[in-house]
Amino acid sequence: MDGRRRNPYELTEDTPVYVISVAAQLSGLHPQTLRQYDRLGLVSPDRTAGRGRRYSARDIELLRQVQQLSQDEGINLAGIKRIIELENQVAELQARAAELAAALDGAATAMRQREAAVHASYRRDLVPYQEVQQTSALVVWRPSRRGQSSD
């Protein structure tokens, strides 16, 4: 979650709205196949208070992906389950990497701001360095005698 309140009536791709018969029709599978996939943990829809299954648009897409991997690619259901687990893990890691990159960018910006403030604070206190030319001239100082004025 991003911390913002969401409209409870807003439909997203994760909103569970489809009953099993509609989900089966949308995915092109038999309802019994959906129940089997749920038992195997391939696609786990949300449940109502009465234990009825409710599928989201994301679940429908996953059902289509499972069917494609099984029928077109010839992957068994155990292999498909592992693929789904790995894809979920990759998605979580990518999200975490994005969070860490954003935190790193924020820390780098804060560091640059603090560094600029430090540089600005000591610029007021420092006197620019100027190299003094060395000379071989000799200045003789003679204290004035009392009562005599110097020209």
Swiss-Prot record:
Checking PROSITE patterns in the record gives: HTH_MERR_1, HTH_MERR_2
Kindly indicate whether the keyword Cell inner membrane belongs to this entry: no
Annotated GO biological process: negative regulation of DNA-templated transcription
Q: What induces it?
A: By heat shock.
- Note the InterPro entries from the entry: DNA-bd_dom_put_sf (IPR009061), MerR-type_HTH_dom (IPR000551), MerR_fam (IPR047057)
List, alphabetically, the Pfam families matched: MerR_1
Domain named HTH merR-type: residues: 17-86
Q: Which GO terms describe its molecular function?
A: DNA binding; DNA-binding transcription factor activity
* Residue range(s) of DNA binding per entry: 20-39
Q: Any idea which UniProt keywords this protein has?
A: DNA-binding, Stress response, Transcription, Transcription regulation
Q: Which PANTHER family match?
A: HTH-TYPE TRANSCRIPTIONAL REGULATOR YFMP, REDOX-CYCLING DRUG-SENSING TRANSCRIPTIONAL ACTIVATOR SOXR
Purpose = Binds to three inverted repeats (IR1-IR3) in the promoter region of the dnaK operon.
Q: What is this protein called?
A: Putative heat shock protein HspR
